[in-house]
Amino acid sequence: MLAKKHGYRSRSAYKLIDIDCKFKLLQRGRYVLDLGSCPGGWAQVAAERVAEGGKAHVVAVDMAPMERIPNVDFVQCDVEHSPELLRAALQDRKFDVVLSDMAPKSCGHRQVDHANIINLCEMALDLAVEFLRSGGSFVTKILQGEYEQEFRRSLQYYFASVTYFKPKSSRSESSEIYLVGTKFKNPEHPYGNSEDAPSEC
């Protein structure tokens, strides 16, 4: 297996490599938060690419245990049901890049799988808005379907640029695709002018 030959824990590592070759997100010295990290392929790539002076600032998060990776801090928690545990672990830390390769267990029904992954994307976006530095970037995996455009519009509130990207290493027949948001904007006022904000009922 190619991933094992190159020392990566999963073939998904090549997806992040493809994404970074296109968008140049993982620059030296940047701080990275990796959501849904297990088994660790993305965290490995991130740590390699942002390392500076032998050190990297990468925090990996997953509900499942993960074997240690050099230069990666691991937080084991369920961000869907216990996000307060992650907040307690991170405290007031801020990141330049938030990555999410999270995916629910597939039930085999395309529409249900799509709705479930959109829920995870929304949760990842909430955490990105909370922990990103101004100007930062966000990458999340989605499955194409009914709610993808609505979610894309949510990203556009927070990022100056939102782009679809399908890595070369993704299977061509898969509905999996990534959304990449760059230039995180207005972290304190995500809707820009007050008239753009949704009204309260």
Curated annotation (Swiss-Prot):
InterPro entries: RNA_methyltr_RlmE, RNA_MeTrfase_FtsJ_dom, rRNA-MeTfrase_E, SAM-dependent_MTases_sf. It catalyses: uridine(2552) in 23S rRNA + S-adenosyl-L-methionine = 2'-O-methyluridine(2552) in 23S rRNA + S-adenosyl-L-homocysteine + H(+). Specifically methylates the uridine in position 2552 of 23S rRNA at the 2'-O position of the ribose in the fully assembled 50S ribosomal subunit. GO terms for molecular function: rRNA (uridine-2'-O-)-methyltransferase activity. The keyword Methyltransferase applies. The keyword Transport does not apply. The active site is at K141. Keywords: Cytoplasm, Methyltransferase, rRNA processing, S-adenosyl-L-methionine, Transferase. S-adenosyl-L-methionine binds at G40, W42, D62, D78, D101. GO terms for cellular component: cytoplasm. It is found in: Cytoplasm. PANTHER family: RIBOSOMAL RNA METHYLTRANSFERASE, RRNA METHYLTRANSFERASE 2, MITOCHONDRIAL. It comes from the Bacteria. Its EC number is 2.1.1.166. This is Ribosomal RNA large subunit methyltransferase E. It is an enzyme of class 2 (transferase). Belongs to the class I-like SAM-binding methyltransferase superfamily. RNA methyltransferase RlmE family.
